[in-house]
Regions:
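Substrate-binding pocket helix/loop in short-chain dehydrogenase/reductase
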Residues: 98-99, 106-111
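The beta1-alpha1 cofactor-binding region of Rossmann-like NAD(H)/NADP(H)-dependent oxidoreductases
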Residues: 40-41, 61-73, 104
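Conserved glycine-rich Rossmann-like NAD(P)H-binding loop of the short-chain dehydrogenase/reductase
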Residues: 28-45
Length: 151
């Protein structure tokens, strides 16, 4: 197992790509923190699948667009696991719509989650990783970064 003993945090891990990443990390030996914004039940299902592989897992609800929430989440990871070795910035939202019809609140929500959320989580994790002199950060982006939607 390539990641035996490593402690990972995956944002947006209750479904989709985040869920698949969390399960893949666990399959390689990592203990995983499953972050979610909405469905605690879905997050707990992912954690149960991880535990069924013989790995440790727990769930943390956090709105990563909030610096305080992101920092508290990473602090919880370190408190529970003693360290953070891997951060996967996966959480993201879409508010697709034509520019002329898009509400400013929708634009702001996308930027604060998809951009500021990555900043918040990375900043919170990197202070521990620097003290450990080790750590990996992976930030996932959407294909929309290459090919935009109509709008």
């Amino acid at each position: 197992m390539k990641l035996e003993g490593k402690k990972a945090l995956v944002t947006g891990a209750s479904r989709g790509i985040g869920r698949a990443i969390a399960l893949a990390l666990a399959a390689e030996g990592a203990d995983v923190v499953v972050n979610y914004a909405g469905s605690e039940a879905a997050a707990k299902e992912v954690a149960a699948e991880i535990e069924a592989m013989g790995r440790k897992a727990f769930v943390v609800q956090a709105d990563i667009s909030s610096n305080e929430a992101a920092t508290a989440m990473v602090d919880t990871v370190v408190k529970e696991f003693g360290r953070i070795d891997i951060l996967v910035n996966n959480a993201g939202i879409t508010r697709d719509g034509l520019l002329m019809r898009m509400k400013e609140e929708d634009w702001d929500a996308v930027l604060t989650t998809n951009l500021k959320g990555v900043f918040n989580c990375t900043k919170a994790a990197v202070k521990y990783m620097m003290k450990q002199k080790a750590g990996k950060i992976v930030s996932i982006s959407s294909v929309v970064g290459l090919m935009g939607n109509a709008g």
